């Protein structure tokens, strides 16, 4: 599973857990633009930045550590692309 899919699934899960919060409402709560949030959810943004993750976590009234603390993320292996290493 790709990193962006993990983040997207986590956002969907937290929205559902908190009473089916819409992405529009999450955008208002977090300060992340609706378009940026939709790009993450749809997988167009492959690597959301830490500032964006932080804003989303705050929107859910949690820390970054809490936002990222779920089984799939804890087992995820980050592997650098070959072209990134060579660059």
PLM features: what roles do these ranges have?
Residues 1-25:
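A short, Lys/Arg-rich alpha-helix, primarily the initiator
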Residues 11, 26, 37-38, 67:
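Conserved hydrophobic/aromatic packing and binding residues within compact polymer-binding modules
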Residues 39, 68-87:
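Short, charged recognition helix plus adjacent turn
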Residues 31-47:
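Recognition helix of helix-turn-helix/homeodomain-like DNA-binding domains
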Residues 20-21, 48-51:
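Residue-level signal for the short linker/turn that defines the boundary of a DNA-recognition helix
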Residues 51-66:
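DNA major-groove recognition helix of helix-turn-helix/homeodomain DNA-binding modules
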